[in-house]
Amino acid sequence: MLIGLTGTPGTGKTSVSKLLEKRRGWKVVYLNDLIKEEHLYSEVDEERDSVIADMELIRERLSGILEEEKGQHAEKAKVNGEEKENITIIESHLAHYITDIVIVLRAYPPELKKRLEKRGYSEEKINENAEAESIDLILAEAFEWCKKVFEVNTTGRTAEETLGDVEKIIDYILAGKENELQEYIPGSLDWIDSVP
């Protein structure tokens, strides 16, 4: 099963993904790293200090990675006699363009700004990301691209606390109990007035 963990930069995707990888042993594809390492982009945006991802190249490369992972999982299951679901997490602010199931991590824009300042982001990039968060940009895109969308508020919470919510969502999906995830249905967070 392929699950996206997405959100504006600074919402906790990487921290939670590392914990998922360690605690659950699930495969995590850190998509932004893969894009840079394997040059899966069409151009470099010097002004914004970023690259323009080539989604076609990314999908092709991910297909290969997922086939490889599927084979490794099947081999491991054969040896260990396991019948566990093969879970792969795609971690990126672009994950919702790849997966049908996505968990969108959110953070109150003023807190998001503080997190990005600690990372040394430029003021322009901080404001751009805080504004994107305040208008629900990634959440809106997730609705457009994905079949199942869940939302987790990371404001004032540690990565471990957020991990508990993400694990619960995935475990309930695996158990067929999605209807019991009402607290993660998107739309309860409204931060439109939080950024001038």
Curated annotation (Swiss-Prot):
Catalytic activity: AMP + ATP = 2 ADP; ATP + H2O = ADP + phosphate + H(+)
InterPro entries to which the protein is assigned, alphabetical: Adenyl_kinase_AK6 (IPR020618), P-loop_NTPase (IPR027417)
Subunit structure: Interacts with uS11. Not a structural component of 40S pre-ribosomes, but transiently interacts with them by binding to uS11.
Residue intervals passing through the bilayer: none
Keywords, alphabetical: ATP-binding, Kinase, Nucleotide-binding, Ribosome biogenesis, rRNA processing, Transferase
Role: Broad-specificity nucleoside monophosphate (NMP) kinase that catalyzes the reversible transfer of the terminal phosphate group between nucleoside triphosphates and monophosphates. Also has ATPase activity. Involved in the late maturation steps of the 30S ribosomal particles, specifically 16S rRNA maturation. While NMP activity is not required for ribosome maturation, ATPase activity is. Associates transiently with small ribosomal subunit protein uS11. ATP hydrolysis breaks the interaction with uS11.
Region (LID), start-end ranges: 118-128
A GO term, aspect molecular function: ATP binding
Cited Gene3D superfamilies: P-loop containing nucleotide triphosphate hydrolases
Record: residues binding ATP: 10, 12-15, 119
SS bonds (residue pairs): none
UniProt similarity note: Belongs to the adenylate kinase family. AK6 subfamily.
Name of this protein: Putative adenylate kinase
Catalytic activity, EC: 2.7.4.3
One Pfam family hit: AAA_18
Native species: Methanosarcina mazei (strain ATCC BAA-159 / DSM 3647 / Goe1 / Go1 / JCM 11833 / OCM 88)
